[in-house]
Regions:
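Thiotemplate assembly-line natural product biosynthesis machinery
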Residues: 1-19, 70-75
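Conserved catalytic core of two-component sensor histidine kinases
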Residues: 38
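Phosphopantetheine carrier-protein modules
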Residues: 12-31, 48-56
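Catalytic nucleophile serine of serine hydrolases
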Residues: 34
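C-terminal structural segments of small proteins and small subunits
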Residues: 53-74
């Protein structure tokens, strides 16, 4: 499974009632609440064995599956 496929699976797990796969403004449109965002970050860290520093926790890095994937790949 590719990084992007894993990211999409995690997004579906965190927010099963909403298809976020093709969404471009997840954060800016308020599609995840604060608890869901923290759950997403924890799941990403666990799945990919990475640490996401506070300076990486910006809307730009979490607005889409593509942005999340790019951030993860930059941290590996």
């Amino acid at each position: 499974m590719s990084v992007k496929e894993q990211v999409i699976a995690i997004l579906k797990e965190v927010k099963p009632t909403k298809n976020l796969e093709n969404e471009k403004d997840i954060i800016e449109n308020g599609l995840l609440d604060s608890f869901e965002l923290m759950t997403l970050i924890a799941n990403l860290c666990d799945t990919f064995g990475i640490e996401i520093d506070v300076d990486k926790m910006t809307p730009e890095n979490f607005n889409s599956a593509e942005a999340i994937t790019a951030m993860i790949e930059s941290l590996k």
